[in-house]
């Protein structure tokens, strides 16, 4: 038996740390000891009963999709050795499969029958041990240590930039400026990757002080508060990381001609006001602007995310992990504190 954080999906206030059976070898030949699991808004929604699906025939789901672990037994995985740090790819292709899943593009699944660790029909990583198929285990640079837990959220950014570049190259395209809306983990990682691409980076968030503006400025980027329309320039690219309806609407109006607005998530930010459908059409049609949604991630995005983290300053990355909690305090980890950026549940030392 082992300890795991589980929840009865669809029912709030049912999350608990409990004893569960050791992972079944049928779940994968690679046995991993958990080091840390990142907490994000999706986990909170699942615990609140708003999202999530348990494995078939079960009522409870093991939480956690932002993983980091150490290989205990590599099994048949030729590229892994005992002691390697790894993270687990989250999404699995649908069983049909659809045309995209059939060629490894499961992030672009067309029929919605994909599954996801810790979210949809497969147990997650918030347990003392977990198993995984070798092809879904991503080796982590040991120099990252516990910061390897940032790999999964970085895949969100890697996929988003891939989409932005693909759209931009439909015509002559030399982007100079990018606005990132939201300075949470995804937004800060988006700013990091934009800086690595040599762009003039601006980040907008509602807080005026604390670790978020400090981290933005430490990157060499510009920090803004207030409305999107008051930043003083028209960005070539906006990476939207809040999911707030009004910010999305304002971003459509604020982006420069030929610009690209990439939406990286959904939220409960209410309805936008003051923007009619005709205004959206005018902004997009007359100025050749594009709005694209992006959900992570297939295998190449995990590799790209690893490359981005390997290039990043370790001390800056460390600033993203603002709180570490033990598994016994998972409930505290799920409750947001004012200066939180990335909270992790730590099972062991990296």
Where do the PLM segments sit?
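Glycine-rich beta-strand-centered segment in the early N-terminal region that forms part
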Residues: 23-37, 52-99, 141-143
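C-terminal hydrophobic helical "lid"/dimerization subdomain
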Residues: 2, 249, 299-350
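Residue-level marker of beta-strand positions
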Residues: 66, 84-85, 100, 129, ...
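Mid-domain Rossmann-like dinucleotide-binding core that forms the NAD(H)/NADP(H) cofactor-binding site
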Residues: 83, 144-228
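NAD(P)H dinucleotide-binding glycine-rich loop of Rossmann-like/cofactor-binding domains
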Residues: 95-178
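C-terminal substrate-binding/catalytic core of Rossmann-like NAD(P)-dependent dehydrogenases/reductases
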Residues: 271-321
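Glycine-rich cofactor phosphate-binding loops and adjacent beta1-alpha1 units
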Residues: 167-174, 217-289
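Residues in the short beta-alpha loop(s) of Rossmann-like NAD(P)-binding domains
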Residues: 205-209, 267, 297
């Amino acid at each position: 038996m082992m300890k795991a954080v589980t929840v009865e999906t669809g029912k709030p206030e049912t999350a608990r740390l409990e004893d569960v059976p050791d992972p079944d070898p049928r779940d994968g030949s690679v046995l991993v000891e958990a080091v840390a699991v990142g907490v994000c808004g999706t986990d909170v929604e699942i615990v609140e009963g708003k999202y999530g699906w348990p494995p078939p025939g079960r009522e409870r789901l093991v939480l956690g999709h932002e993983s980091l672990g150490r290989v205990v037994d590599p099994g048949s995985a030729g590229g892994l050795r005992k002691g390697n740090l790894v993270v687990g790819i989250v999404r699995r292709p649908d069983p049909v499969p659809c045309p995209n899943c059939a060629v490894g593009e499961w992030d672009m699944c067309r029929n919605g029958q994909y599954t996801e660790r810790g979210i949809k029909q497969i147990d997650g990583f918030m347990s003392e041990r977990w198993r995984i198929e070798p092809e879904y285990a991503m080796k982590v640079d040991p120099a990252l240590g516990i910061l390897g837990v940032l790999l999964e959220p970085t895949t969100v950014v890697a996929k988003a930039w891939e989409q932005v570049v693909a759209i931009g190259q439909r015509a002559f395209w030399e982007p100079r400026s990018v606005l990132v809306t939201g300075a949470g983990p995804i937004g800060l990682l988006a700013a990091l990757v934009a800086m690595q691409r040599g762009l003039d980076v601006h980040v907008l968030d509602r807080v005026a002080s604390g670790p978020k503006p400090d981290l933005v400025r430490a990157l060499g980027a510009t920090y803004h508060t207030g409305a999107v329309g008051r930043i003083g320039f028209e960005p070539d690219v906006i990476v939207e990381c809040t999911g707030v309806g009004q910010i999305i609407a304002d971003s459509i109006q604020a982006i420069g001609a030929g610009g690209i607005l990439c939406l990286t998530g959904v939220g409960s930010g209410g309805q936008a006001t003051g923007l009619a459908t005709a205004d959206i059409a005018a902004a997009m049609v007359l100025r050749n602007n594009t709005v694209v949604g992006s959900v992570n991630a297939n295998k190449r995005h995990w590799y790209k995310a690893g490359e981005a983290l390997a290039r990043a300053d370790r001390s800056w990355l460390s600033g993203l992990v603002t709180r570490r909690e033990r598994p016994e305090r998972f409930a505290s980890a799920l409750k947001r504190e004012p200066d939180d950026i990335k909270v992790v549940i730590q099972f062991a030392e990296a």
